[in-house]
């Protein structure tokens, strides 16, 4: 049975950026299997900011992996930016992801031997997007967007965790993706840096980006307009928690 989905019709009738349809994901464990996602369905439309919450080990990060194509469902469909992600070959999947999805990881995953500037240029190089000279200019612009232009030539290990996370967000924006997916983006940050990251996410959504975020921080999650709560591999709650808390954040 398809779960209640308050955003199925989208903002102003917009088409979904993300469609998750009856998705099941099981992993083999010895001679048996463990089912982590149990028939999940929901849509996300252009310009939405959605927080995915729930206890550890209940399928939140697995769901993000389905949406980004890092992993594939055992059953069901995952359609993102019009592509049936679960059906793409690895080569086509990598090309699609490089163009359409920006991923912000919990532990930054910046290449330690490259400067912040080089790390942000790398997705453009891999996707062969933008002219070589424009890539550098764009990377500097993105570093300026996250307040790190003066740190451009430093290695990741020379800046703070909060600065690395902001650089990781800039890297996720390198190819101007329609969708940004963030897995515990504030999990290793103090409250001030967490607030800065959320403020940046809010500005990106205001500019028309679509953002999906997994978080354990209940207070920050409440500031996001829509919450999807996953418990035991199923959607237990999918609701809008109000523009009043989000407005002016």
Write out the residue ranges for each language-model feature.
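H-loop (His-switch) and adjacent beta-strand-loop-beta switch element
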Residues: 227-240
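ABC family nucleotide-binding domain
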Residues: 16-230
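ABC-family P-loop ATPase nucleotide-binding domain
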Residues: 1-26, 237-249
């Amino acid at each position: 049975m398809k779960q209640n989905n308050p955003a199925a019709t989208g903002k102003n009738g917009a088409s979904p950026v993300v469609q998750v349809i009856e998705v099941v994901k099981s992993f083999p464990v010895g001679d048996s299997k463990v089912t982590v996602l149990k028939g999940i369905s929901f849509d996300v439309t252009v310009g939405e900011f959605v927080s995915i919450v729930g206890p550890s080990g209940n399928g939140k990060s697995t769901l993000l992996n389905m949406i980004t194509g890092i992993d594939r469902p055992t059953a069901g469909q995952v359609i993102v930016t019009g592509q049936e992600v679960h059906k793409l070959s690895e080569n086509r999947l990598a090309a699609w992801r490089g163009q359409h999805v920006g991923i912000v990881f919990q532990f930054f995953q910046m290449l330690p031997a490259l400067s912040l500037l080089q790390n942000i240029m790398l997705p453009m190089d891999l996707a062969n997007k933008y002219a070589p000279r424009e890539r550098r200019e764009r990377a500097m612009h993105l570093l300026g967007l996250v307040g790190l232009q003066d740190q451009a030539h430093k290695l990741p290990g020379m800046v703070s965790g909060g600065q690395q996370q902001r650089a990781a967000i800039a890297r996720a924006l390198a190819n101007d993706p329609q969708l940004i997916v963030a897995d515990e983006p504030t999990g290793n940050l103090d409250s001030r840096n967490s607030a800065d990251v959320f403020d940046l996410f809010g500005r990106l959504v205001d500019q028309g980006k679509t953002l999906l975020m997994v978080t354990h921080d209940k207070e920050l999650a409440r500031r996001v307009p829509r919450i999807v709560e996953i418990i035991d591999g199923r959607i237990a709650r999918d609701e809008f928690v109000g523009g009043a808390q989000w407005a002016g954040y």
